[in-house]
Amino acid sequence: MSQVHKTKIVVSPWTVLLLAVFAAMGSPVLLAALLLAALCHELGHYVALRVFGAGVDAVYISAFGAELRLSDRPPLSYGQEILAVAAGPAANLLFSAVLSRCGKQMPELYIFAGAQLVLAFFNLLPVRPLDGGTLVWLLLAWRIDPFAADRGARWIGGIVTAALLLCSLWLLVRSGNPFLLLGVVGLGKSFWAEKGLVKRKETR
């Protein structure tokens, strides 16, 4: 009989605080749309990982996203990991298309479709630890070299983060809206906290 793999879920206190502030200041419908989009995103990752036989030991949920910690065995190939990473945004795009189609009968669903679309494109930004940055690293490591992939991913992520910072500062000056700036600062903090090489090509 196969053993059931248990997955631990850890939620950061900052996540709870952020949700409480958002619920107090924003629309409950928008909050529900964002939570559903996040759930669909992580479900896409999880289903793909389980299809490839990978065990998910824990899910860490922070104010800036979620991280799935995998068990050591069995290791995924580069191709499998690329598909598993891409499955998150792909799930958002799929649900966005379905919700948009249903929105013809229920216009409120367009908000949910939009949240799915925004989360998909945000996660495809080529900045680690976002999915887009991870995909850049995996593709470079697969085709060139893992150490060169580290350098390339950091350069690309740094340039994109700097561009986003300039755009958010411009928006702050023009409209006085600090939310994009706070998001970019949080993304930049996660980017600079990213560790170096964690995989070797010869193990794939």
Annotate the PLM regions.
Residues 1-204:
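Hydrophobic transmembrane alpha-helices and their immediate loop junctions
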